[in-house]
A protein has these predicted regions:
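N-terminal metal-binding scaffold of metallo-dependent hydrolase/deaminase domains
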Residues: 2-5, 20-72, 84
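Bacterial N-terminal signal peptides
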Residues: 8-17
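Acidic, glycine-enriched loop/beta-strand segments at the rims
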Residues: 24-30, 43-55, 67-68, 362-370, ...
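His/Asp/Glu-enriched, well-ordered alpha-helical/loop segment
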Residues: 40, 102-103, 109-115, 119-121, ...
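Divalent metal-coordination and catalytic microenvironments
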Residues: 41, 56, 61, 83, ...
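Active-site core of metal-dependent hydrolases
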Residues: 53, 149, 230-321, 336, ...
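Polyanionic/metal-chelating signatures
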Residues: 134, 141-280
Length: 440
């Protein structure tokens, strides 16, 4: 019997050892050493400008020079980009990346949502898991930064921007507490399509959904009224973390991200911003094309949840989600493109931009919608979003057009000047099973 258990133990350890070998061993890169120079590159700056046969110098994680007449210092590490396309690192504008791993009911891998209507004091950054297998997959497709946000019923909590090459959440932190997320209740009597967006609202079959929605809207307003009064007081008998969380909103240091797809939801968001003096960002924007002029007049940016989607309403054109980015661009709305179907599917962010470029945007406008526009909305455009001197060296090099599935073949990526691995779990499995079946 003893020998039987010993044999079983050995077999078990062998299985674990084999599985361990199958796991990726992708480590965060060390700091940049010396000066690096990308030469003979076609540089897509991110602001609409294209430079041909250009050179990019970066040192200590910062871009020091970009142009066609740049002198390369002696001893610099040269990266020949002849025939290649160079872009700013892509930015995922709203995601549960690192908070949610396996969506199909594996609770231990998910930490993106708290119970209750008011979780204003929640900070998503502390739950960010740098060991997520999804991070490397997104990074291999050019996404170098992500805006990580919580989810919830109503007042969801605070978001942060992370860079996708780190050992822990402290290292990953790019900009902490960028804003607060709320989910605007739906004012549709019946749900339908993406326009019936109503995250987390559980209504009984016999209840009045509109009354329930207005009650929840009053809950949001009451919270901000109480938070404003709290923040105006200099001394408090007791600290209230939920009310304190809104202080930066009233001071204009953070933005209020409002999940809203319906026109009525967005109108309520605009009104909320005017009432309390908040900087509002619409997240979703399925029907934003219907009020594009109003959004532009009120300087309300939009994070479009998905381009590869069905229309929000049965009366919309079948290709309306493809056309919405161009319509917002024409109206003068600052917008960014997103992909929210699934964390691993977000690797297709650049292809959403490619579709938008087919339906009215220019290629460089589409690129801006996943780089510089996103950086502006998140308040990080002073350090990233474009390839310009003084900004972080967040750079991707591709064999071809990154907006096209056929051309998006990355050869190198840099995050704050560090040469970052392109390997990921999916690539390793691809190589593993090629080897098994003798495929070259």
């Amino acid at each position: 019997m003893k020998n039987k258990y010993s044999t079983l133990l050995i077999l078990t350890l062998a299985v674990f050892a084999n599985n361990a070998k199958a796991q990726e061993t992708v480590y965060p890169a060390g700091p940049q050493k010396g000066v690096s120079a990308i030469t003979h590159a076609t540089v897509h700056v991110g602001n609409g400008t294209i430079l041909t046969d250009a050179t990019i110098l970066f040192e200590k994680g910062k871009i020091t020079a970009v142009g066609t007449g740049v002198s390369i210092p002696k001893g610099a590490t040269e990266i020949d980009a002849t025939g290649k396309q160079v872009y700013p690192g892509l930015i995922l504008p709203s995601s549960s990346l690192g908070l949610r791993e396996i969506s199909s009911g594996v609770r231990g891998s998910n930490d993106y949502q708290e119970i209750g209507e008011n979780n204003a004091d929640i900070r998503s950054i502390v739950s960010y898991n740098t060991d997520s297998k999804i991070i490397n997959v997104l990074r291999s497709n050019g996404i170098l930064l992500a805006h990580v946000s919580p989810s919830g019923e109503l007042i969801e909590g605070r978001s942060s921007v992370v860079q996708l090459d780190a050992w822990n959440y402290e290292d990953a932190e790019y900009k902490a507490n960028t804003g607060m997320y709320i989910s605007m209740p739906s004012l549709m009597a019946r749900r339908g399509g993406r326009g019936g967006f109503m995250r987390g609202m559980m209504m009984g079959g016999g209840g009045d959904p509109l009354k329930a929605a207005f009650d929840k809207i009053e809950t949001i307003k009451t919270y901000f009224i109480e938070a404003k009064a709290y923040c105006q007081e200099k001394v408090h008998a007791n600290n209230n973390l939920k009310l304190e969380a809104a202080r930066a909103l009233f001071e204009g240091k953070q933005k209020l991200y409002v999940r809203a797809n319906e026109v009525k939801q967005m109108l309520l968001a605009i009104d909320l911003g005017k009432t309390f003096g908040f900087n509002i960002v619409i997240v979703g924007g399925g029907e934003s094309f219907q009020i594009a002029g109003l959004l532009a007049d009120n300087k309300i940016p939009v994070i479009l949840d998905e381009t590869h989607a069905l229309p929000a309403s049965e009366d919309d054109d079948v290709d309306q989600p493809y056309k919405t980015p161009a319509q917002l661009q024409k109206a003068g709305v600052l917008f960014a493109l997103n992909d929210v179907s699934d964390n691993s599917k977000q690797r297709n962010l650049s292809f959403n931009a490619g579709t938008a470029a087919t339906y009215g945007l220019t290629k460089e406008e589409a690129l801006s919608s996943i780089t510089l526009n996103t950086a502006k909305i998140l308040g990080i455009d002073n350090v990233t979003g474009s390839i310009e001197a003084g900004k972080d060296a967040n750079i991707i090099i591709s064999m071809g057009d990154i907006l096209d599935m056929r051309g998006n073949q990355l050869t190198q990526i840099f995050i704050q000047g560090r040469t970052v691995s392109l390997d990921n779990k999916q690539l390793q499995l691809y190589e593993r099973y090629k080897h098994k079946y003798g495929i070259k």
